[in-house]
Amino acid sequence: MMKRIFNLLSGPRNISTALMYSFAQHPDFVVVDEPFYGHYLRQVSDRSSHPMDEEIQKAMPHNKDQVIERLEKLAQEKLVFSKSMAHHCIEEEPRYLLDWTNIILIRHPKKLIHSFSKVIPDPTLEAIGIKKAFGLYQFFETPQGARTGDRE
């Protein structure tokens, strides 16, 4: 069975938004921008690098299961391209991602930090998402993250 949700796991200040807009032009896709952001903001204590967090929390669902349900419902009608931030995935072993096609987008760290520091001074590895992206990569590469038939 073809996986119908394509989940781009990126960090801020990458080309992820441009990539999302390119998928939005394809008639077979519906595009969702950072669907787990509301859930993430509800869970983290330091929101200093999220200047519009109150507005985002009012506008977006806080419940991870509701977000997953919405994406899977959309996937019944069309292919789904979800532009997600790696650090918005707060679980150690996000098994729900195993049913989706996941793409990890990584920008050269030096360029990423330089770009991000123009917006947020002294960015941390957590804020730029690179640490979480690596953790997700490790999860996908472990036996519990691998699924029979998905790998050689």
Residue ranges: model-predicted function:
Residues M1-A75:
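PAPS-dependent sulfotransferase catalytic core
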